[in-house]
């Protein structure tokens, strides 16, 4: 019985802490779009405009591969 009560109190406490920190961090991320593009360019291995490419590899970042160039 005591163990059940301790477990319930612990779950309620952890839930309350998560809700409090979620409300505190709301609106603090300033440049969401910039972070997304930076993260994408770092996480993928793609080639920039003018780089050599293959149509079957899909390795151009923004452009499609035409005539062997991005």
Swiss-Prot record:
Domain of life: Eukaryota
Keyword Disulfide bond on entry: yes
Signal peptide extent: 1-22
Site (Important for calcium channel binding): 58
Propeptide position ranges: 23-45
GO CC field: extracellular region; host cell presynaptic membrane
Keywords, alphabetical: Calcium channel impairing toxin, Disulfide bond, Ion channel impairing toxin, Knottin, Neurotoxin, Presynaptic neurotoxin, Secreted, Signal, Toxin, Voltage-gated calcium channel impairing toxin
UniProt KW Transport keyword: no
Tissue/organ expression: Expressed by the venom duct.
Main subcellular location of this protein, as a coarse class: secreted
Coiled-coil blocks: none
GO molecular function, one term: calcium channel regulator activity
Chain's role: Omega-conotoxins act at presynaptic membranes, they bind and block voltage-gated calcium channels (Cav).
Notes concerning its domains: The presence of a 'disulfide through disulfide knot' structurally defines this protein as a knottin. The cysteine framework is VI/VII (C-C-CC-C-C).
Name of the protein in question: Omega-conotoxin-like Bu1
Gene source species: Conus bullatus
């Amino acid at each position: 019985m005591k163990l059940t009560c301790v477990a319930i109190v612990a779950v309620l406490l952890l839930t309350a802490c998560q809700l409090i920190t979620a409300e505190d961090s709301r609106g603090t991320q300033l440049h969401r779009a910039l972070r997304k593009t930076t993260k994408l360019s770092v996480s993928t291995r793609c080639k920039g405009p003018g780089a050599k490419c293959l149509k079957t590899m899909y390795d151009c970042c923004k452009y499609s591969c035409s005539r062997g160039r991005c």
